[in-house]
Amino acid sequence: MIDDIYNKAILELAGNIPRLGRLPDPDASATAHSKLCGSTVTVDVKMDGDVITDFAHDVKACALGTASSAIMARHVIGAKADEVRKVREIMRKMLKENGPPPEGRFADARYLEPVRDYKARHASTMLTFDAVVQAVDTIEAKRGAAQAQVAGAANVG
């Protein structure tokens, strides 16, 4: 039943979403949008090395998109780049391939497990995970380009 996906835990998460707003100086921002439901999540991320040190988000989403964003916001600080990539893949498999929910830092995502039976809700549930990985990828790409530029300048001199 659809009541399963809008359970008490989901509604409590959606109603208590931390870290709302935007960072004044993010290392990268990314936006993910669901064409199906119109939900949009924009994230701002700061990193030190491969660790996320600050995070904020602007969430215009249904209860499921908001709940998944709340889970991300509660647990992303201190996460490593590979960790957020891994949790995105675990979430995708949980929803689309009947895989197990995440464990560890992002274990609260287990509350989203009933969403797997409602394909139309998968995209909004994945928005925050996709946006965070996109922002991390952007940060790493910028760093790689900067390192290549420095290496190129050193070879010229």
Question: Which sequence ranges carry the predicted segments?
Answer:
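A short glycine/serine-rich beta->alpha loop
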Residues: A30, D54-A61, L112-R121
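C-terminal binding/interaction regions
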Residues: M1-G21, A79-G157
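Structured beta-strand/loop patches that form or line metal/cofactor-binding pockets in enzymes
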Residues: L13-V59
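A short glycine-/small-residue-rich loop at the edge of a beta-strand within enzyme catalytic domains
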Residues: M1, A32, V59, A63, ...
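Catalytic-loop motifs flanking and including active-site residues across diverse enzymes
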Residues: L64-S69, S124-L127
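Alpha-helical support elements that line or immediately flank enzyme active sites
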Residues: S68-K80
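Alpha-helix initiation and capping sites
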Residues: D4, K8, K35-S39, C62, ...
